[in-house]
Amino acid sequence: MIIRSPEPEVKIVVDRNPIKTSFEEWARPGHFSRTIAKGPDTTTWIWNLHADAHDFDSHTSDLEEISRKVFSAHFGQLSIIFLWLSGMYFHGARFSNYEAWLSDPTHIAPSAQVVWPIVGQEILNGDVGGGFRGIQITSGFFQIWRASGITSELQLYCTAIGALVFASLMLFAGWFHYHKAAPKLAWFQDVESMLNHHLAGLLGLGSLSWAGHQIHVSLPINQFLDAGVDPKEIPLPHEFILNRDLLAQLYPSFAEGATPFFTLNWAKYAEFLSFRGGLDPITGGLWLSDIAHHHLAIAILFLIAGHMYRTNWAIGHGLKDILEAHKGPFTGQGHKGLYEILTTSWHAQLSLNLAMLGSLTIVVAHHMYSMPPYPYLAIDYGTQLSLFTHHMWIGGFLIVGAAAHAAIFMVRDYDPTTRYNDLLDRVLRHRDAIISHLNWACIFLGFHSFGLYIHNDTMSALGRPQDMFSDTAIQLQPIFAQWVQNTHALAPNVTAPGATTSTSLIWGGGELVAVGGKVALLPIPLGTADFLVHHIHAFTIHVTVLILLKGVLFARSSRLIPDKANLGFRFPCDGPGRGGTCQVSAWDHVFLGLFWMYNAISVVIFHFSWKMQSDVWGTISDQGVVTHITGGNFAQSSITINGWLRDFLWAQASQVIQSYGSSLSAYGLFFLGAHFVWAFSLMFLFSGRGYWQELIESIVWAHNKLKVAPATQPRALSIVQGRAVGVTHYLLGGIATTWAFFLARIIAVG
C-alpha cells in the first residue's frame, strides 16, 4: 500500500439544469438523430428508429452525455422492476389463495390468477386444492413470502403499494439526475468511491438489514407456522421488533440482548444463527437460522470490503495501482492501461459485468434445487423446474450479451495506438492459436460425444445391448464427478467439522428428505448416462464460446477483411465486388452465437427435467418405498438418441398434446402457437433480401394501379434486420414451446 499526500477535498460533481425538460422534443420521433428526425421516406425508418433509440453512442460522442443517459435509463429500469414487483404482490393480495396455501402447503398448490369467463376460458381455472379454482403458478413467490414472514394478504397489499411508491421515486430520480442535477463525468469515473459505496452500502448494509429482518421477523413467524399455529394468531412483525420478551420465549438468549456480542460469548446466539447444513425436515428448505447466519456473515465481509479503497484519505487501495502491478511472466505489460479502458468504455465495463452476472445466474439455477432456500419449494416440482429453466436461459442470454458488448468495445472504443504489449494486445496477437485450438476442441468433443450416442443407437438397433455404453454393459462412470460428490459428502467430518451435515443432500451420504409424502431431495446418483450427456454439454458450450470469442478477437480485423473496424459493429458484407465476405461482422457472430447458446441451454434443461423426474422427484409410501415420476428410466433410456426422442420428448409431450378440454389447455395452445412462431422465423432466416424486394415492388405496382400507394415507400428488411427478426422469433418460439411442454407435463404429473 502506497502512502500518498491527502487527496484534494470533495469537488462539486453535478451540473445544475443541464438539459431543459421539453415534451415537444420527446413528442418528435427520432429527436436524438438528425437523419431519423426528418421523418420517414421509406419503411426502413421505423426499424432505424428502434435500432438507434437506445444506442446512445450514435446520438453523441461526448462520454459525459452518454454516461448521463445510461445512468438515467437505469432509474427507468428500476422503476419498471418495482412496477413489476408491485404487480406480483398485488396479484398475491387480490387474486391468490396465499392464506389457504400457508395453512396447508403440502396439499394446496399456489395460484394467483383467476381467469374471467368471457368465451368459456374459465376452464383454465383448475382445482388447486382447498376449494380454490385458478391457474397454478410456478414462480416461487408464495415460498419466498412465507420465508420472509408474510402471513396475510393485507401485508401483500401494503408491500404492493410500497413498491409503487418506490417505482415513482425511481422515475423521478431518472428525470432529476438528467434534467436537474446531472453528475459530471468525473463522478462516473470515481471507481474507488463507487466500490466503497456499492460494497458497504448495497451489499453490506443490504445483507445486514435482511439478516436483521430474518432474525427479528422471519424466524419467529416461521417457528409458529412450522408448529401449526394459525397465521391469524401469530403476532404481527412489529410486535416481535418492539417486544423483546416475545422473541425471548422462542429464543431464550434474546433476553440477554447485546451482552454476549460485546463479551465475545457469541455461542449464545447459536439458537438463531446456526451452522447446521442440510434441509429442515419440516419444510424441505434450508434452515432459516442458517440463512440468517449466512446473511450476517456476508454483511460483515462486505462492510469490511467497502472500506478498502482510497478516496479522500491517504489510505487504502487504488484500482489503477492494483491493475498496473498485475504482471505475469507471459503477459508483458499485464493490466497496464486497463484502468483507462474500464473508465472510458462502458461497453468494456458492461461486458465484464454481464459475463460475471451470467455465470452467477447459472450458479443460482443449480443452487435452487440442490440447496432449496425457501420452505416447501423442494416439493413444488413445477416451481423447481421453472426456476431452473428460467435462470439457465437468463444466464445464457447474459453471457452472449457479454460477448456482444466486448465486440462493440473492440470496434468503437479500442485504440490500438495506445495499447501495446498489454494483456489484451498479447491475446489479440495470438488469436489464431486460440481460435484454431478451440476449433479443434469443438471437433473433438462433437465427434466423440455424438459418436458415443451413435454407437449406442447402432448397437441397440442391432439388438446387441451387451455392447452398449451403459451402467449394465460397458461402463463409462463419471469417476471425477463421483469423487467431487464424495468429497463434499464427507466434508462435515473432515474439512468442515463445525457443520452437522453437508451443504447439499445431492452429494450423497444422507437419508432422503420427504415432506408431505413427496421427495424433497435425495442423493443424486451419476452414471454412464450423465457422462454421455455431460460431453454434449461440453461440446455445445465450447462451440458457443468459439463463435462468440472469434467475434470479439476478429472484430477489428482479419486476414479476409483487414479494415473490418472501419465497417462498424454490424454490416451485411464487405460491399459489392467482394464476394464471400458476408456474415463476418461482430454482430453476425453474436447472431450465430445465440443459436448455439439456445442449443446448449436446451440440452441442459432437458437433462435436468428428465434426470429429476427419473431419479429424484416422486412419492414415498408409509413403508418408505420411493416411486419416481418416470421410474428411474433415465440411466437406460437417455444413452441413445432414440431414447431421448422416444422416452423424453415424445413420451413426456403427451400431457401437453392431450391437454385440450382440461385446465391445462392453454399450454396446448401455446405449444402449438409457439411452434408456429418458431417456424415463422425460418422464413426470415432462409430467404434473401432480393426475393422480398422483388415481391414488394410487384405489390407496390398493384397499389399504384388502384391509386392506393402510400407516401412512405415500402422496403424489404435489410439483411441484418431480417436476421435480427429471425433469431428473435427462433428463440422466443423455441423457449415458449419448451415452457408449455415442461409446465403441462410437470403440473399434470408432479
From Swiss-Prot:
Chlorophyll a binds at M683, Y691. The keyword tRNA-binding does not apply. Chlorophyll a' binds at H675. The keyword Transmembrane helix applies. [4Fe-4S] cluster binds at C573, C582. It catalyses: reduced [plastocyanin] + hnu + oxidized [2Fe-2S]-[ferredoxin] = oxidized [plastocyanin] + reduced [2Fe-2S]-[ferredoxin]. Pfam families: PsaA_PsaB. Phylloquinone binds at W692. It is found in: Plastid, Chloroplast thylakoid membrane. It is an enzyme of class 1 (oxidoreductase). It is a multi-pass membrane protein. The chain crosses the membrane at residues 70-93, 156-179, 195-219, 291-309, 346-369, 385-411, 433-455, 531-549, 589-610, 664-686, 724-744. GO terms for molecular function: 4 iron, 4 sulfur cluster binding; chlorophyll binding; electron transfer activity; magnesium ion binding; oxidoreductase activity. Its EC number is 1.97.1.12. P700 is a chlorophyll a/chlorophyll a' dimer, A0 is one or more chlorophyll a, A1 is one or both phylloquinones and FX is a shared 4Fe-4S iron-sulfur center. GO terms for cellular component: chloroplast thylakoid membrane; photosystem I. One of its GO terms (biological process) is photosynthesis. It comes from the Eukaryota. PROSITE patterns: PHOTOSYSTEM_I_PSAAB (PS00419). HAMAP family: PSI_PsaA. Belongs to the PsaA/PsaB family. The PsaA/B heterodimer binds the P700 chlorophyll special pair and subsequent electron acceptors. PSI consists of a core antenna complex that captures photons, and an electron transfer chain that converts photonic excitation into a charge separation. The eukaryotic PSI reaction center is composed of at least 11 subunits. PsaA and PsaB bind P700, the primary electron donor of photosystem I (PSI), as well as the electron acceptors A0, A1 and FX. PSI is a plastocyanin-ferredoxin oxidoreductase, converting photonic excitation into a charge separation, which transfers an electron from the donor P700 chlorophyll pair to the spectroscopically characterized acceptors A0, A1, FX, FA and FB in turn. Oxidized P700 is reduced on the lumenal side of the thylakoid membrane by plastocyanin. This is Photosystem I P700 chlorophyll a apoprotein A1. It comes from Phalaenopsis aphrodite subsp. formosana. The lineage of its organism: Eukaryota, Viridiplantae, Streptophyta, Embryophyta, Tracheophyta.
